[in-house]
From Swiss-Prot:
Signal peptide: none annotated. It catalyses: (2R)-2,3-dihydroxy-3-methylbutanoate = 3-methyl-2-oxobutanoate + H2O; (2R,3R)-2,3-dihydroxy-3-methylpentanoate = (S)-3-methyl-2-oxopentanoate + H2O. It is an enzyme of class 4 (lyase). Keywords: 2Fe-2S, Amino-acid biosynthesis, Branched-chain amino acid biosynthesis, Iron, Iron-sulfur, Lyase, Magnesium, Metal-binding. Binds 1 [2Fe-2S] cluster per subunit. This cluster acts as a Lewis acid cofactor. This is Dihydroxy-acid dehydratase. It comes from Bacillus thuringiensis (strain Al Hakam). It comes from the Bacteria. One of its GO terms (molecular function) is dihydroxy-acid dehydratase activity.
Length: 557
């Protein structure tokens, strides 16, 4: 066993003595040591119940004849961090999480790991660590939150609350109505109830094969999640016995399938960023062109909030992720069904008995929302390395208009609220990329303000930053190269005409190459917004969004 490094041999007497101080007995040194990587934190509603989850996981690991050791990672709640400097720490926290898990697990030579994530950056951070460490691992997330209902019976979620702010600001609802939405938008523990980033990543974790069937859709408060925990411990023991590791599971084909599900569900645009980072950790050559190829062959089968009024509980009721995959498997060339997963079985075996129970929620191949996926990769002179749009969350497929340029999210939000944006405009928020932000903050507040003011179908928004999974409308993010790297978005001037063509996958500014070259020569890189601390270091080391915004290791040659 891997853990023999710290528990076997006469020279490990000091190690065993320390381990006995934690409560271990001599007989425990013949059992696998299992890291329980938890992310309990009280300020995040998606994680406030994970302390109890950790206890259940440890009980299940002991029952399976192994020895559990629990530790915690940090976490950032993107909703609470939204709209202020806290959002700059969200994406960088993914790297801290990955590094901290790597540190604890490799320092103590665990034989296997169970990860308990839930919200936005915690899940991909742990997945990156699992691929980096590469020991048998099973994920079991905390589960989605239930949707809420206002006193009028309207179904609401966190997206409704953000959009309610814009609606109140524009006089469309009263303060009492906003308070009603606020009080009911987040009714329970769990990851926010729509197809936002957290739920998108937990669903992708399931289809990748690192988590068990049901992981993405079973609610946090559903007793079936406790059964999932028991299964996770049992399956981990099998993975250890068979020496099946994350890099055996997360292959190029598995990532294809993850993006296929993403396209079928119209997931968060952040999945592109995080899954590209996973590919980097797995040592795979995977780029945005391959994502685009998946998008072209996968139909959009279900719309979940913010693209509709359906939520994760509805997906679960309709058959869950397995039912979506089973329906997708009917189309040749969409899924790779014979690859291994954390169940110890193939994807084909995992979904064999799944079926759609509500075709209003999960559409059939014969009745898709669209013939192509709910995410699209755009390219053009404004995004030479690519950009991402959640095409399933807007009915507008082509938009052309003049730029209204803001050099920060705060500046943009103030401008939108003051009425500086009108129908037909293209809002540009730049210098908010991985390096320029720094931290590539999400633009949920501006998109929600636009939607809440009734301009969602009449105003486009472009940024080198990110969007929350709760964002909707004509929102194009992850524009690469970013402004801080001298990308074309930095060269835009007020009034330039921009064209967004979703069907043709184009993002263009109607300015000649000669004029752009002239502007590039005159452009000067702004001073970094942050020069000290973690964000200062992050800004110096982070790569572009089109490669997952991972940290680059300096060349010491």
């Amino acid at each position: 066993m891997r853990s023999d490094m710290i528990k076997k041999g006469f020279d490990k007497a000091p190690h065993r003595s320390l381990l006995k101080a934690t409560g271990l007995k001599d007989e425990d040194f013949d059992k696998p040591f299992i890291a329980i990587c938890n992310s309990f934190i009280e300020i995040i509603p998606g994680h406030k119940h994970l302390n109890e989850f950790g206890k259940l996981v440890k009980e299940a690991v002991r029952a399976a004849g192994m020895v559990p050791f629990e530790f915690n990672t940090i976490g950032v709640d993107d909703g609470i961090a939204m709209g202020h400097i806290g959002m700059r720490y969200s994406l960088p926290s993914r790297e801290i999480i990955a590094d901290s898990v790597e540190t604890v697990v490799n320092a103590h030579w665990f034989d296997g790991m169970i990860c308990i994530p839930n919200c936005d950056k915690i899940t991909p951070g742990m997945m990156m660590a699992a691929l980096r460490i590469n020991i048998p691992t099973v994920f079991v997330s905390g589960g989605p939150m239930a949707a809420g209902k206002t006193s009028k019976g309207d179904v609401v979620d966190l997206s409704s609350v953000f959009e309610g702010v814009g609606a109140y600001q524009s006089g469309k609802i009263s303060e009492e109505e906003l308070k009603d939405i606020e009080d009911h938008g987040c009714p329970s523990c769990g990851s926010c109830s729509g197809m936002f980033t957290a739920n998108s990543m937990n669903c992708l974790c399931e289809v990748l094969g690192l988590a068990l069937p049901g992981n993405g859709s079973i609610l946090a408060i559903d007793p079936r999640r406790e059964e999932l925990i028991k299964q996770a411990a049992e399956k981990l023991k099998i993975l250890i016995e068979r020496d099946i590791k994350p890099r055996d599971i997360v292959t190029e084909e598995a990532i294809d399938d993850a993006f296929a599900l993403d396209m079928a569900m119209g997931g968060s645009t952040n999945t592109v960023l995080h899954t590209l980072a996973l590919a980097q950790e797995a040592g795979l050559d995977y780029d945005m062109n391959r994502i685009d190829a998946v998008s072209r062959r996968v139909p959009h089968l279900c719309k979940v909030s913010p693209a509709s009024n359906w939520h994760m509980e509805d997906i679960d009721r309709a058959g869950g992720i397995s039912a979506i995959l089973k329906e997708m498997s009917r189309k040749e060339g969409v899924l790779h069904l014979d690859r291994i997963t954390a169940t110890g079985q193939t994807l084909r075996e995992n979904i064999a008995h799944a079926e759609i129970k509500d075709k209003e929620v999960i559409h059939s191949l014969e009745n898709p929302h669209s013939e192509e996926g709910g995410l699209r990769i755009l390219k053009g002179n404004l995004a030479k390395d690519g950009a991402v749009i959640k095409s399933g969350a807007t009915e507008v497929k082509r938009f052309e208009g003049p730029c209204v340029i803001f050099n920060s999210q705060d500046e943009a939000l103030a401008g939108i609220m003051l009425g500086k944006v009108k129908k037909g405009d293209v809002v540009v928020i730049r210098y908010e990329g991985p390096r320029g932000g720094p931290g590539m903050p999400e633009m949920l507040a501006p998109t929600s303000a636009i939607a809440g003011m009734g301009l969602g179908a009449d105003v486009a928004l472009l940024t080198d930053g990110r969007f929350s999974g709760a964002s909707r409308g004509i929102s194009v993010g992850h524009i690469s190269p970013e402004a801080a790297a001298g990308g074309t978005i930095a060269l835009l001037e007020q009034g330039d005409i921009v064209c967004i063509d979703v069907e043709e996958r184009l993002l263009e500014v109607r300015v000649s190459d000669e004029e752009l070259d002239k502007r590039k020569k005159e452009w000067k890189r702004p001073e970094p917004k942050v020069k000290t601390g973690w964000l200062g270091r992050y800004a110096q080391m982070v790569t572009s969004a089109n490669t997952g915004a991972v940290l680059k290791i300096p060349n010491f040659d």
